[in-house]
From Swiss-Prot:
EC number per UniProt: 2.7.7.3
Gene3D superfamilies to which the protein is assigned, alphabetical: HUPs (3.40.50.620)
Binding residues for substrate: 9, 41, 73, 87
Protein name, UniProt field: Phosphopantetheine adenylyltransferase
Subcellular compartments: Cytoplasm
Annotated S-S bridges: none
Main location: cytoplasm
One record GO biological process: coenzyme A biosynthetic process
Pathway terms, separated by semicolons: Cofactor biosynthesis; coenzyme A biosynthesis; CoA from (R)-pantothenate: step 4/5
Alphabetical UniProt keywords: ATP-binding, Coenzyme A biosynthesis, Cytoplasm, Magnesium, Nucleotide-binding, Nucleotidyltransferase, Transferase
Sites marked Transition state stabilizer: 17
Molecular function via GO: ATP binding; pantetheine-phosphate adenylyltransferase activity
Record's GO cellular component terms: cytoplasm
Annotated organism of origin: Cupriavidus pinatubonensis (strain JMP 134 / LMG 1197)
Length: 161
């Protein structure tokens, strides 16, 4: 059984993320979407919220499971018996960071491969950061996220902590 892990902060889950999940779920028997704790990134949504959002967006994929994780990706990959780490590459600017991470992951997990997927054309420019900024400033994010994510954003923005 081919198992892959698609890790990320998913703050929030965008249509670009879902596009990669859809395509990766057609390649692997099981895809585990790993929602990272990522305290250094100071996420807009809590880990629990990001897991809930991802499960709402991805719940219709029978071979996709969403789990949160803290700590090293290598431990999460091992825990899930995955043989592949799936990563998205939007632009050349993503490549250097992702290339370095893939090298480190290969060092830590010599028997696990990193597979890069490029987004479909309409999602190449979408990032969680852009979506959050547009939403906070009152802009329309409906083309970038699913309606359930729009609701999560609106609720979070209307109730600042």
């Amino acid at each position: 059984m081919a198992i892959a892990v698609y890790p990320g902060t998913f703050d929030p889950m965008t249509r670009g993320h879902e596009d990669l999940v859809r395509r990766a779920s057609n390649i692997f028997d099981e895809l585990v979407v790993g929602v990272a704790h990522s305290p250094n990134k100071r996420p807009f949504f809590s880990l629990e919220e990001r897991i809930s959002i991802a499960r709402e967006v991805l719940g219709h994929y029978p071979n996709v499971r969403v789990e949160g994780f803290a700590g090293l990706l290598k431990d999460f990959v091992r825990k899930n018996n995955a043989r592949v780490i799936v990563r998205g590459l939007r632009a050349v600017s993503d490549f250097e960071y992702e290339f370095q991470m893939a090298g480190m992951n290969r060092y830590l997990l010599p028997d696990v491969e990193t597979m890069f997927l490029t987004p479909s054309d309409q999602y190449q420019f979408i990032s969680g950061t852009f979506v959050r900024e547009i939403a906070v400033l009152g802009g329309d994010v409906s083309k970038f996220v699913f309606p359930s994510v729009e609701r999560w954003l609106a609720e979070k923005i209307s109730k600042p902590e």
